[in-house]
Regions:
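Short, Gly/Ser/Thr-enriched beta-strand-loop segments that form substrate-interacting elements
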Residues: 605-620
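Catalytic domains of carbohydrate-active enzymes, especially glycoside hydrolases
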Residues: 10-53, 196-213, 392-402, 482, ...
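A glycine-rich, often tryptophan-bearing local segment used as a flexible ligand/cofactor-contacting loop or short
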Residues: 521-601
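The substrate-binding groove and active-site-proximal loops of carbohydrate-active enzymes
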Residues: 6-13, 30-36, 171-191, 275-293, ...
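Hydrophobic targeting/anchoring helices
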Residues: 28, 45, 62-66, 197-198, ...
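Polysaccharide-binding and catalytic clefts of secreted carbohydrate-active enzymes
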Residues: 70-331, 348, 440
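Extracellular ligand-binding/catalytic regions of CAZymes and related secreted enzymes
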Residues: 221-224, 231-234, 412-444, 566-571, ...
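Short helix-loop-beta junction
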Residues: 469-492
Length: 720
């Protein structure tokens, strides 16, 4: 790497550790110092000549006001576990399954009208006259009911401990007041917050950037009473924690119909992001989004009036913000900050329409990491953690620009880890070099353009619902992560986009997920027009790549609606007496690299024998291709992220786009990758592995052969 560079780095400062803060600010090339949850900045740090980010969580840290206005706390619907009646009455203790420090029953008149009791055996609501709430005991008693039927109660609760603070508190064994969260849906809360932020800006003249962490509503995170199942429900994309009787009343007024508890709790399944949303949920999301923009803009305008920038953290209480909604720019944010473990999260940040894109690296400077494993404590290896996260992120940074990087947490924890400090210095310099390359021009991409088709489309570009470790069970997150660092143009589309003609911009459409999921598409595949348009598009030369149960929907002659294009289908039990086409697997195009591993699915069968099976395992298809007109259908029964499988995906996409023979700017060693920036004539080569690697790259200036140390990056000029 070349001479030392500075800037584009946000350092978490810490009062009481001024010398360390200022020393690392210089070493890591920081231009900004921030505070974090649990830390402050002293005058010495504030006056040291750096930009200052100040973190505000707009809906918490207001305990005095919250205590005086406890009916303005944020809320949620909860549903009890189903109980079987053994006689004609049943008593259900509402809070039996839930963490008492997180929730308090809201039995106010406004909330109570939204409570529901259901007979889950019949699926019918129990009439109001058959149940009664006993406030003192916290029980709902149901009478005159059918023995041996199952019953649930859906009720409203106040959330009395803000979830991110609750997590940080329990993780770090803090002993301080539990922070509550207030709901800006109430006019009184809005007045209080507008006055509060005005006052805050007056008192923090040194702050250059107000870091909103985040806006109003947290993703749903319901904790249980039993440590054997502490996290009952967690969904990063869920709107469950935006609910209140006032929001529901205002919704009914605006949309002309009322939502019920059942619209949210869905018999205990909730309305998870992984299932296609019904129109009622989409209406409610739009309603909340409208409100969050309308009130959020007022707060941001005040920040701007005080000549400060407003950045927002794209995590935690981000719900209702929707950066991939066409209206996001109405907020007026100057910057977006995303915490990242993975490449797809860096791409999620870089694609947002905002002036400054910043990623917060991991590990976070806490003793333990998100999974509860030691980080900055005995048994931890923060340097190795940082390397693993950096190699995930680096490949994505080569494809699309990010403007800034940074860290968060307790800076003093890094003192016993000089190798960690050295490594952050190295990657900060690396990042600044990559950033400069993007300024000069875009990196080379292959010609084949890819679209990912699912029920959410653009709104959930790159992500599914949270971090990789929260969504690893879905094939698509593995595909997104693989794509995040490949030299391919990627967009995310939904079924309406197909109707509007988006296929004209695509060479390959990937549909990956289990039947009924938002990622496969579920009921959207009943739209014959979309099936027709996709079929015609493949016939004219496009490629449909299906993974797991693509286009799956019961009720038709085939389980996969695109079976005629794929040349295969899945037997769900109705073809048990039918004969099967035999096959011989031949990978004539050499698509499958050594070490690639695709887990097969039972009951996948060829429809008419015309599809070519390229790879199989134990007699089950693991990769197939089917010519259809000028195009093709390609099938993979699963996809799991690995270096080998990432190269397999790249090969399959190049094959789909008839680019297999063009190997320009693709490394011959799959443990390495490269990016070429034509305007700068700069080639960046990265080693993703923990071993020394030798790699050769075809360029327009001849072959380049390099040796790379474990995890290393080489940046070199080629050509003139």
């Amino acid at each position: 790497l070349s001479k030392k560079t500075t800037g584009a780095f946000t350092l978490p400062g810490e009062s009481g550790y001024e010398a360390l803060t200022l020393e690392l600010a210089e070493r890591w090339g920081a231009d900004v110092i921030r505070d974090s949850d649990g830390t402050q900045l002293s005058d010495e740090i504030i006056n040291a000549g750096y930009g200052i980010y100040s973190t505000i969580c707009i809906i918490r840290d207001h305990n005095e006001w919250a205590s005086q206005n406890s009916d303005k706390l944020q809320q949620s619907f909860l549903i009890t576990n189903p109980k079987v009646a053994v006689q004609d009455y049943l008593s259900i203790y509402l809070m039996e399954d839930f963490f008492a420090e997180q929730f308090r029953v809201n039995d106010s008149k406004e909330a109570f009208k939204y409570w529901q009791v259901f007979d889950r055996t019949t699926g019918e609501e129990v009439p109001r006259e058959l149940w009664n709430y006993e406030r003192e005991s916290g029980n709902v008693v149901i009478t005159g009911i059918a023995p041996w039927h199952k019953y649930t109660v859906s009720f409203m609760v106040y959330r009395i401990w803000e979830e991110i603070s609750m997590y940080n508190h329990t993780t770090n064994h803090w002993e301080k007041e539990h922070l509550m969260q207030i709901d800006p849906i109430y006019v009184e809360t809005q007045k209080y917050l507008l006055h509060w932020i005005e006052d805050w800006c007056h008192k923090h003249k040194e702050t250059t950037v107000v870091r909103f962490t985040s806006l109003f509503y947290n993703f749903a995170w319901i904790w249980g009473s039993d440590e054997r199942n502490r996290h009952l429900f967690s969904d990063w994309g869920s709107y469950d924690f935006t609910v209140s009787s006032r929001a529901l009343d205002l919704f009914a007024k605006k949309y002309g119909y009322s939502l019920t508890a059942e619209d949210f709790v869905n018999g205990g399944k909730y309305r998870v992001s992984h299932i296609p949303a019904q129109q009622r949920k989409l209406d409610y999301m739009a309603f909340i989004n409208d409100f969050v923009i309308e009130f959020g803009k007022q707060l941001i305008d005040i920040v701007h009036k005080h000549d400060k920038l407003a950045y927002v953290f794209y995590d935690d209480s981000w719900v209702g913000m929707e950066p991939y909604n066409d209206r996001f720019e109405e907020f007026g944010f100057d910057g977006m900050i995303k915490c990242v473990f993975s490449g797809y999260e860096a791409r999620l940040c870089s694609g947002v329409k905002v002036d400054t894109h910043e990623i917060r690296l991991h590990p976070y400077l806490f003793p333990v990491g998100l999974g509860g494993l030691p980080t900055f404590m005995e048994g931890g290896n923060p340097t190795l953690d940082a390397k693993k996260y950096w190699i995930n992120i680096r490949r994505a940074l080569l494809r699309e620009p990010i403007d800034r990087i940074g860290l968060g947490g307790y800076l003093h924890l890094v003192e016993p880890y000089p190798d960690f400090c050295d490594y952050i210095e190295k990657i900060a310099g690396e990042f600044r070099e990559i950033k400069e390359l993007h300024h000069k021009g875009k990196p080379y991409q292959i010609k084949t353009k890819v679209a990912i088709l699912h029920a959410w489309g653009k709104l959930r570009s790159w992500t599914l619902s949270g971090h990789f470790h929260e969504t690893y069970m879905h094939d698509l997150i593995h595909i997104n992560e693989a794509l995040s660092g490949l030299p391919i143009e990627v967009q995310f589309i939904d079924f309406e986009d197909i109707r509007q003609g988006v296929l004209q911009e695509c060479d390959v459409v990937i549909n990956a997920g289990s039947a009924g999921s938002a990622w496969s598409g579920g009921e959207y595949w009943s739209d014959h027009k979309c099936v027709d348009l996709l079929t015609a598009w493949v016939y004219e030369g496009g490629t449909f790549i299906g993974v797991n149960q693509p286009s799956a929907l019961e009720g038709y002659d085939s389980f996969f609606r695109m079976a005629h294009v794929l040349g295969l289908d899945e037997d769900t039990g109705s073809k048990v007496a039918h004969g099967r086409w035999t096959f011989e697997a031949r990978d004539e195009q050499d698509l499958v690299p050594e070490g690639a591993s695709i887990t097969p699915k039972n009951n996948i069968y060829l429809t008419d024998g015309s599809a070519a099976v390229l790879c199989e395992k134990s007699g089950m298809i693991t990769l197939s291709a089917h010519a259809f007109g000028k195009g093709k259908g390609i099938y993979l029964p699963s996809f799991t992220l690995s270096f080998e499988n990432t190269r397999l995906l790249l090969n399959v996409i190049r094959y789909a786009g008839n680019e297999l023979k063009d190997t320009k700017y693709i490394t011959d060693n799959l443990y390495t990758e490269c990016a070429y920036y034509p305007e700068s004539k700069i080639l960046v080569v990265i080693n993703n592995s923990d071993q020394l690697q030798k790699t050769t790259i075809d360029t327009e200036y001849g072959q380049q052969t390099l040796e790379l140390d474990p995890f290393d990056t080489i940046i070199r000029t080629i050509g003139d």
